[in-house]
């Protein structure tokens, strides 16, 4: 049991600093908000979590305003539990990504599992049925025993939660770098489907309407989890296990089904619904009231508790999982109680909506908190941080491009070594632990450019992906941010889809350090530039700052999650070559783009230099490839990313054990160049004339560089290796490194 301090003791001891409040913020609460009254223990705790970066985005809010968030396809953008995008037929796709980085270092299994649980609740709080999970993971060097343990437990946590709740984990990405050794990134994206009429909002309005607590009971787990996620790691951070929540996917499954039933069958009595996520009960309820311009009066005696003698501070700040808040029309309380009882879940009336604009809590007959509701939510402070260009950026800008030389005799060995690099090597050993087929909607499972799920009752499908190459952002945050969006769109296009919108997880260092804030705001400029050019507005997202360990920051890593629409399932395209005799086509020109590449990192052990990115060419090439796919001219498509052309060709040949015979006017090194905006396609010879005619109507560049063979040999200029040997290296590298 936590011992409450008196208001005077809080002021004198300054314990609020440990909870994340600054002296200035504490004085603002006391003098400006409470009119000179000292905040009590519960109130101080509530402000500490609600004014954390994790909850109020006080450092990043000005940056987020840069993003384009509207478009004809957008039904609901940032501000609700998740974004909503129209896909026609009175249907919409709902999606969002969340981070659970700090908890996943302290308790990797539970941190990753509850990250999945939280984002799933965000989706069904909108009224949507979750249909897919994707993850974007970053770890330290895999030759480190601690890293291997974290990789094993994080992937087990994601698999355990998703598999048990019955939602397929269909895609994602994994990368390794020294900067993540003490601060792994666990970003989870969830996608759902909904009929327009069932779309919900997280609001509490209508004086006298009831506030219901539904789901699991409240414990002491996760208290100050939001504050924990809003500061750097230090030497004692690994012991902060009380800030990590514990999940129960079977409870979440019941909660999901109960909430969907309320929304679909009792929508007329439901005013609003919201997940109890970061900052638990205080966050969900105060945000619902603030958005509606209401007040709330809550009786904490009614909060279901799984531990004894919990005090108001603990009940309000607990981040126990599998809990939701519902605002229900007055007079219909019993209907809600009866429905949740059917699922053996608590559904308890804990308060009511008021019109006084205050957030008032009672416990054992005593008022234990009384503050303006907007001061907890909408009126939380916003800071405009100083931005300063890091010294390394000017150094990279002034430097020459990195240009490796690879001899004919060395190119095959270089290729083999690249195949075994942890970031390039097959992640099959990870994604095979996930159930990617449950719900039976998965058409393209993990391993291709994007996952594809059919939309039942229509002829449509959804393509989805997560992407970010943080090395590019380290060299140039603006171009790197733009590339992250462009690569996500390339993956959607290569799967036959039209990109619709993005969600993001902005993983950066300490925003109070000018160089770190510059990385954040500059990356946002690049993301915005690509989103505008590619017509992919930002509809939801998450900010995770303070990703530093003992003062050392991670690489800037804005993970981009994207969903695209495939209008006709016949246009679904995968990356693998289909049959011998098909022509291999390279779309896009190749230049000497090695700065930040896998090749540079492998050969030199570092990344340096300046990068180029032509967004206009990217858009032209994407439009051309999508048109060729929808015209039925393409048998396979694969985007070029890490490792360049040689790796993309190999990955295209692997699935069906085919060979390739490629002659292309590139140097040995250029086979591994990472020039953006490129695709590898295969087409039937009988479609070549139609393909070339379509090319004349576009300004895209394209050339036939070879053909698919059945001899089991990968031959690219002077590079030659058997497909079987290459597959063995590619699929065996990660399992071997994990031993």
Curated annotation (Swiss-Prot):
Keywords: ATP-binding, Cytoplasm, Ligase, Magnesium, Metal-binding, Nucleotide-binding, Purine biosynthesis. Mg(2+) 1 binds at residues 98, 542. One of its GO terms (molecular function) is ATP binding. ATP binds at residues 57, 96, 504, 541. Its EC number is 6.3.5.3. It is found in: Cytoplasm. One of its GO terms (biological process) is 'de novo' IMP biosynthetic process. It comes from the Bacteria. The active site is at 54, 100 (proton acceptor). Mg(2+) 2 binds at residues 122, 275. The keyword Nucleotide-binding applies. Pfam families: AIRS, AIRS_C, FGAR-AT_linker. GO terms for cellular component: cytoplasm. It catalyses: N(2)-formyl-N(1)-(5-phospho-beta-D-ribosyl)glycinamide + L-glutamine + ATP + H2O = 2-formamido-N(1)-(5-O-phospho-beta-D-ribosyl)acetamidine + L-glutamate + ADP + phosphate + H(+). Its main location: cytoplasm. Substrate binds at residues 99-102, 121, 245, 319-321, 544. Part of the phosphoribosylformylglycinamidine synthase complex involved in the purines biosynthetic pathway. Catalyzes the ATP-dependent conversion of formylglycinamide ribonucleotide (FGAR) and glutamine to yield formylglycinamidine ribonucleotide (FGAM) and glutamate. The FGAM synthase complex is composed of three subunits. PurQ produces an ammonia molecule by converting glutamine to glutamate. PurL transfers the ammonia molecule to FGAR to form FGAM in an ATP-dependent manner. Monomer. Part of the FGAM synthase complex composed of 1 PurL, 1 PurQ and 2 PurS subunits. NCBIfam families: FGAM_synth_II, PRK01213.1. Belongs to the FGAMS family. This is Phosphoribosylformylglycinamidine synthase subunit PurL. It comes from Lactococcus lactis subsp. cremoris (strain SK11).
